[in-house]
């Protein structure tokens, strides 16, 4: 599945019960956010009791390293409390990390809505400019390249820019890459952000 990353694990807590945890990791398609959706499934024959703490961690980045000074990084969980999960039932919740410039209002993230938006975006990229060769590995590599290309567009002071990434140079240009390879490719993806 090209639009989500899912990790599944099992937990046997002895007297506390058994459960399965499914975690999905995804970036927001239009917000400065990374989302983690959790499903906690009671695989035991007895009810399971779970406490989700209130989490609202905030930190500020070094103002000398930001274009606009210090940024606020916020980590939250959208659900908290004490829950009883019956055998076979599922408890779902989301955690997310967001980033803000000074003075920007806080975001309220709905993890399931973000997942649906991502599925829609990636599906549209996969439906456009499809490579079909005798080798399914090459076809899959090309499909993944569309995700990599479309998700490497960053908002800069000069407007949206495609960049190589690399953790230090997000708003940098590798001129030959942009001019020779990616810019002619973008209109065929159908992703309006890439060519407007």
Residue ranges and their predicted role:
Residues 12, 27-29, 84, 134, ...:
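Residues embedded in well-ordered secondary-structure elements
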Residues 5, 23, 34-36, 177:
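Generic hydrophobic, aliphatic-rich segments that mediate packing or membrane embedding
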Residues 123-195:
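Substrate-binding groove/exosite segments of carbohydrate-active enzymes
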